[in-house]
Amino acid sequence: MYDIKKWKHVFKLDPAKTISDEDLDKICMSETDAIIIGGTDNVTEDNVIQLMSRVRRYPLPLVLEISNLESTMPGFDFYFAPMVLNSRDVTYHNGILLEALKEYGHMMDFDEVIFQGYVVLNPDSKVAEKTQANTDIDTQDIEAYALMTDKVYRFPIMYIEYSGTFGDMEKVRAAKDNLEEAHIFYGGGISSISDAKAAAGVADTIVVGNLVYNDIKQALKTVKIKGKS
């Protein structure tokens, strides 16, 4: 079994977006620690299967971020189940999970299901709109969400999502300082190696997504944050 707490860098691929075989090969052979498949819009059974089958040729961990029931399927090493803590809609806190458990609970391997305390912080992002996230939160709120993740729910991961813009690293640090057991993931707006280094200086794991499609060369450079130390 893979140890998620050793991951420093992961690429997130959107099944609704197009990526060439050449670029996918570069991503999967880049020494990233894992690939996450997930997105906000138009995530379907067909496009998840297609992308999964292409990535499965490579010997690295493959994760499905659960966004809807239709596209949830066997064949992944892990399933990330985001509990959007600052959502105003219970659907994105435990509603999707409830439906998944009703449908697949009898066959789930819960060692593969990783629950995340997920906090969305970019008010202009699609994910904030879809989940009805309250993004108007301060450092004290972030600290409380960290305690909620770590001490109340005891989720193994807190995921801070700025989706589309580079975030406030002081808020990420405030969350990190209030976690004892949970591992912190950061995603959002990483568009250069300098952004990647700044995020990696605070978060345990950085997630690089849109940059794969916007500038593959810059995306590949972000793997350098792993270093050789």
From Swiss-Prot:
The keyword Transport does not apply. Pathway: Membrane lipid metabolism; glycerophospholipid metabolism. SUPFAM superfamilies: FMN-linked oxidoreductases. GO terms for molecular function: heptaprenylglyceryl phosphate synthase activity; magnesium ion binding. It comes from the Bacteria. Sn-glycerol 1-phosphate binds at K12, Y159, I160, E161, Y162, S163, G164, G189, G209, N210. Keywords: Lipid biosynthesis, Lipid metabolism, Magnesium, Metal-binding, Phospholipid biosynthesis, Phospholipid metabolism, Transferase. Gene3D superfamilies: FMN-linked oxidoreductases. Its cofactor is Mg(2+). Belongs to the GGGP/HepGP synthase family. Group I subfamily. Prenyltransferase that catalyzes in vivo the transfer of the heptaprenyl moiety of heptaprenyl pyrophosphate (HepPP; 35 carbon atoms) to the C3 hydroxyl of sn-glycerol-1-phosphate (G1P), producing heptaprenylglyceryl phosphate (HepGP). This reaction is an ether-bond-formation step in the biosynthesis of archaea-type G1P-based membrane lipids found in Bacillales. Homodimer. PANTHER family: HEPTAPRENYLGLYCERYL PHOSPHATE SYNTHASE, PTHR40029. This is Heptaprenylglyceryl phosphate synthase. It comes from Staphylococcus carnosus (strain TM300). The gene is pcrB.
